[in-house]
């Protein structure tokens, strides 16, 4: 029998993964008219818009199990490809219009394939190569410059803003964010955050010359504070650990991001970022996350275990680093409340899954029942 609570969540998840009615309207127009309207390869979505995804036929009806399985899956690769192509459109315009030597990189959820929206935002780093910051303790050889990197980044930001307004006259270029520009609308079917920056050559990068060890320097335009970040090391370390567990980390991250989105839709916002959630699950047990085909509920079991342990031992949680080691995941005591909210969402859904498996509506999930879920095949 369908579960009304999960019927609503499943419908929201379908919309999230395939797009809102307005997004689909533009997509459909692009397909039928074969217009270049932000859907860089309109044929990519021709099938996706109308066909169901494989997870929609797994489990029984609109159940907690079907919801969990669906929440773990990547969005269709054709949506993700269009996200990258939208970033490439921005890159091409900036390359042509700016008198700067620039490098471009995509960071965030999309390159990690942990986004849960078909029409996901894209984070595009634009990196001015005329100068860089470097760790003086490294072994590299550099020539000093009299230029202030903060001025270089702010000038790049202003030039990029003007170039984007010229290249995409019907789009909105928002210059209010302290660290990035945001371009939306017009012919673009993805919101793109454009992050002006320069390279930061870490000690490790100077030694090994691996790009994952190379960082970037960005600026808070309001305070002129330099912010050093290592997005490629974040991506590399999560990918490497995910490879150890048959994709289990990505599935757990998507699951938690979906629960967070549904919590907001149901009236309770959870103030943890996508970056925080990904960093949190990086500390999960890879062996526990490892699973065979059709045994994905093992991912839910480990997600439940880790969140409950950290919620009950917050002093341990506050010692955990983000994957690239640049800061702690939880930097303030108030984050405990947000972790508790997310944990409660997991606890609620894992109990519903257990009840669907056992057929006993009074069952409550506990760690001693983990094998019931781990051994359950979901076709």
Curated annotation (Swiss-Prot):
* Keyword vocabulary terms for this entry: Antiviral defense, ATP-binding, Magnesium, Metal-binding, Nucleotide metabolism, Nucleotide-binding, Nucleotidyltransferase, Transferase
Q: Which reaction does it catalyse?
A: 2 UTP = c-di-UMP + 2 diphosphate; UTP + ATP = 3',3'-cUAMP + 2 diphosphate; UTP + CTP = cyclic CMP-UMP + 2 diphosphate
GO BP terms in the entry: defense response to virus; nucleotide metabolic process
Annotated GO molecular function terms are: ATP binding; metal ion binding; nucleotidyltransferase activity
Q: Where is UTP donor bound in this sequence?
A: 109, 257, 274
Give residues annotated as binding Mg(2+) 2: 123, 193
Residue runs in coiled coils: none
Cofactor(s), by name = Mg(2+)
Location of the motif Pyrimidine specificity motif (R/Q)xW in donor pocket: 328-330
In the Enzyme Commission scheme, what number(s) does this protein have? Answer: 2.7.7.-
Q: Where is this site: Important for uracil base recognition in acceptor pocket?
A: 229
Name the positions where Mg(2+) 1 binds. 123
Q: How is the cofactor bound?
A: Binds 2 Mg(2+) ions per subunit.
Summarize where UTP acceptor binds, as residue positions: 107, 123, 179, 229
| Family statement | Belongs to the CD-NTase family. E02 subfamily.
What the record says about its domains? The (R/Q)xW motif controls pyrimidine nucleotide specificity in the donor pocket, while conserved Asn-229 is important for recognition of uracil in the acceptor pocket.
Q: What does this protein do?
A: Cyclic nucleotide synthase (second messenger synthase) of a CBASS antivirus system. CBASS (cyclic oligonucleotide-based antiphage signaling system) provides immunity against bacteriophage. The CD-NTase protein synthesizes cyclic nucleotides in response to infection; these serve as specific second messenger signals. The signals activate a diverse range of effectors, leading to bacterial cell death and thus abortive phage infection. The effector protein for this system is membrane protein Cap15. A type I-B(UU) CBASS system.
Please give the name of this protein. Cyclic dinucleotide synthase CdnE
**Name of the gene encoding the protein in the UniProt record:** cdnE
